[in-house]
């Protein structure tokens, strides 16, 4: 019998082992769809971004006009821009749900996969930040100024570091040029990291909602999960196109319709919605260095997840106390997101400070204690 090209061709067999004949646990739920949805987000963003870059001019005097020109004069330029801007929001929705799934079901115990995932999140955040600066509107400019300025809190080398990053003494043309360069480069770095992420995942195989070994009950990825993924793609792309066509500026800041002006500061400087939780934590500490450290810790704390796992069970499926704590954490993150969008005044200051303390307390203290308590209750 002739050899099957899908299983023997050096390149095709890699694709086959990753997407077609991949042994997959039969009981993974829709929460396992977000990995592939992130892949679709990445491909959509690279495609729309490439088309936008073809019409963009990274120069302070032309950037704003070039984006306006793309929307007015390029065939479907408005649609490409709206898909790209809102695609970023969907990217973050998917990655937050993906991380939440990993946290709930104990997927972080695959340490290599989890750590590469956190690095992916950090790279995505960097990409989104530099991308937001490119239209060179008011919020682009002041957002870049405020966030890059945080590096000056680093003792001794801070100020030098900031001026080196800016390429001058303020956010100006060199800054915009290098941000465009980085925004073009980073998505390809994300693609490379994604391959590493998947390589580590396929070493161990997928986790499942029960958190027990599923070697005795595996089914091929195709057609079962390929079809399930396509359903996910359809729903997400339908939502993305709907928002891009019906309400493209829903998540944006009206301030960004005004060209950047270093002489006028917007009344409320705030990042896009997906960074608001971290921004609230940054603002809740009345000290610059302390705020920067808290901001970094709010995301880097994910690296500690494998070490904070004290339960004898992997997932939270059969751990009601940990479940309660998990949803408290989700609610807390939503409160932080809301606080990040509000002005710095009473009562928002104190709410933000309490929510920030709660965020770290739940993850660092309450989760391990609750896990130990649940172990005791089960008489382990």
Curated annotation (Swiss-Prot):
Q: Name one GO cellular component term.
A: respiratory chain complex III
Kindly name one Pfam family recorded for this protein.
Cytochrome_B
Record's keyword terms, sorted: Electron transport, Heme, Iron, Membrane, Metal-binding, Mitochondrion, Mitochondrion inner membrane, Respiratory chain, Transmembrane, Transmembrane helix, Transport, Ubiquinone
Gene Ontology MF term list: metal ion binding; ubiquinol-cytochrome-c reductase activity
Cofactor binding note from Swiss-Prot or TrEMBL: Binds 2 heme b groups non-covalently.
The residues listed in the UniProt record as binding heme b b566, with positions renumbered to this chain, are 98, 197
Q: What else is known?
A: Heme 1 (or BL or b562) is low-potential and absorbs at about 562 nm, and heme 2 (or BH or b566) is high-potential and absorbs at about 566 nm.
Question: What is the protein's quaternary organization?
Answer: The cytochrome bc1 complex contains 11 subunits: 3 respiratory subunits (MT-CYB, CYC1 and UQCRFS1), 2 core proteins (UQCRC1 and UQCRC2) and 6 low-molecular weight proteins (UQCRH/QCR6, UQCRB/QCR7, UQCRQ/QCR8, UQCR10/QCR9, UQCR11/QCR10 and a cleavage product of UQCRFS1). This cytochrome bc1 complex then forms a dimer.
What family does this chain come from, according to its entry? Belongs to the cytochrome b family.
From the Swiss-Prot or TrEMBL record, give the protein name: Cytochrome b
What's the source species for this entry? Harpactes diardii (Diard's trogon)
By which gene is this protein encoded? MT-CYB
């Amino acid at each position: 019998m002739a050899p099957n090209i899908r299983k023997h061709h050096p390149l095709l067999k890699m694709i086959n082992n990753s997407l077609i004949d991949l042994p997959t646990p039969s009981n993974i739920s829709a929460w396992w769809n977000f990995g592939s949805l992130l892949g679709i987000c990445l491909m959509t963003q690279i495609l729309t971004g490439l088309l936008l870059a073809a019409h963009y001019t990274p120069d302070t005097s032309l950037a704003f006009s070039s984006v306006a020109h793309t929307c007015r004069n390029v065939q479907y330029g408005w649609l490409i821009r709206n898909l790209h801007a809102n695609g970023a929001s969907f990217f973050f929705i998917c990655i937050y749900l993906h991380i939440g799934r990993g946290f709930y079901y104990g997927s972080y115990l695959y340490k290599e996969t989890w750590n590469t995932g956190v690095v992916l999140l950090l790279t995505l955040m960097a990409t989104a930040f530099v991308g937001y600066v490119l239209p060179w509107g008011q919020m682009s400019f002041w957002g870049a100024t405020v966030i890059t300025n945080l590096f000056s809190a680093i003792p001794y080398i801070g100020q030098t570091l900031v001026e080196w990053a800016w390429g001058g003494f303020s956010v100006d043309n060199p800054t915009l040029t290098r941000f465009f360069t980085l925004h073009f480069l980073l998505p390809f770095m994300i693609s490379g990291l994604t391959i590493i992420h998947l390589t580590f995942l396929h070493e161990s195989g997928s986790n499942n909602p029960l958190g027990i070994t599923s070697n005795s009950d595996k089914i091929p990825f195709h057609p079962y999960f390929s079809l399930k993924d396509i359903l996910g793609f359809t729903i997400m792309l339908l939502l993305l196109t709907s928002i891009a066509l019906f309400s493209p500026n829903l998540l944006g800041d009206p301030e960004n319709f005004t060209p950047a002006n270093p002489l006028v500061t917007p009344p409320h400087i705030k990042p896009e919605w997906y960074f608001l939780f971290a921004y609230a934590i940054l603002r809740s500490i009345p000290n610059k260095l302390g705020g920067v450290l808290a901001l970094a810790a709010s995301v880097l704390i994910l690296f500690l997840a494998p070490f904070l796992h004290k339960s004898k069970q992997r997932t939270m499926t059969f751990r009601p106390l940990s479940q309660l704590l998990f949803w408290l954490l989700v609610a807390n993150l939503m409160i932080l997101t809301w606080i990040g969008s509000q002005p710095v005044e009473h009562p928002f200051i104190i709410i933000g400070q309490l929510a920030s303390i709660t965020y770290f307390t739940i993850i660092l203290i309450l989760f391990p204690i609750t896990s130990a308590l649940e172990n005791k209750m089960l008489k382990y």
